């Protein structure tokens, strides 16, 4: 059956700021306390979406979350009106205010893990929400992510959206950022590669930075998504690269159809994995970048592998990269050599995503890949699909509500909270989502 990959990109939230909340993510730590520009951030993301849609790629949007997230502060013992809580937490525990104001839901590669219908035992598209257990600010996301996905993938005859795994370290799950699918045509059965950083009985794990994904979680997600057991491979990421800032597998590898583009040091038992894939995937091709051409540290600094690898109509592939790759002489030299060689990657396209990149999120972080047949695509909420009208509407919406300068101190401004809620109220109507946010369900928008 014919199917296509649809990229669902996350819209950057109104409270996008640099707080250094993500230990193990070196860009996040390095840019802590810098002044951010939320309006520029959301527009950089929109420009990427629109450019790819104009080039013929199927593109959709996933909205941001409600931030600052007052219910989490109430759980932490802060009391009073919303405004009083903001004032208290800003004075008593500003770190918590930054955490509940994080715009991290924009990195929807961590929203869920997706199984196309061709790989599922029941013939449905499955999406299992990630619990993002390793970081407090990200562990807040799962309930609203689930509500948003249910509002987008509404048809229960076509889609099954599963709640996140229990919030315990043993089942730490980071979603599609640690998942790749390889195969031939999108509509044919593929091989799903689940990548983990640790497992309970295995002492091989990083020493400096946390391994966020557990094998136990990956196995549970594969079961929930009803992935055919004959089509699954579980592989451990190289703990040494995690300790160099590769906090998700999509910082060191990306796949599309029969191609795996990765660093030579990406996986713990890389030769074994490559041989498995060669046996299981017809026409499999591994493009392994040697350290002598691109070091792991340069890959992390430029996000070479946090790229999008997209199939074009002629069978060739386009590699979508952040501008940091072009700015790095060695990486750019390698890329120009790559597209001149005999492999499916025949073109590269560069985007300026500096606002997201400074928090450690490149092109791949910003998108969730969902393979859909024509019938399944018709069942998706049509209001989220990118086109000229939606691009114009979202830019006007961003101009109206987003600030062009934000610091950590601004997060305590009650006006920012009100601006955000009003913006999301408008957005849910624009995208036909219904009342997906807690403030809409409690009437807090009136208060």
From Swiss-Prot:
GO terms for biological process: arginine catabolic process to glutamate; arginine catabolic process to succinate. It comes from the Bacteria. The active site is at residues 174, 248, 365. The keyword Phosphoprotein does not apply. One of its GO terms (molecular function) is N-succinylarginine dihydrolase activity. It is an enzyme of class 3 (hydrolase). Keywords: Arginine metabolism, Hydrolase. Catalyzes the hydrolysis of N(2)-succinylarginine into N(2)-succinylornithine, ammonia and CO(2). This is N-succinylarginine dihydrolase. It comes from Salmonella enteritidis PT4 (strain P125109).
